[in-house]
Amino acid sequence: MTLSELRVDVVILTCAISAGIHGALVREHFDDGAGLGAGFVVATVLLAALAVALTRRPTQLVLASAALVFAGLLASYALAVTTGLPVLHPERETVDGLALFTKAIEAIGLALVATLLRRPALPVAFLQAKGTPT
């Protein structure tokens, strides 16, 4: 197993853990509002789909999608605890241990995905081959 394969496996694990936690909290968040509950359903479905897609074929598109979902979840939680989410949950959410654990898992997933995304190589035109006149 290569280091890249291990990183993909950990990203799959982070997607699965986060999907499980979001799925377990759906009912509780539907009690707070339909929009908030629906958001947790969407997060669960997206994370589960990413875990499956990464297991089957971890393409750059799937990795970029995982990065987007993780970043979105982290940003939405930051908004939820600082200002609230307009329309969905205008009151500020209280910070709790499970939420912090989930966000730590998602941050690990995001950091690992960032290392797996390919960056285009920059052409280096100013270098000359060894032994050629300058």
Predicted feature descriptions by range:
Residues 1-134:
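Membrane-interface extramembranous regions
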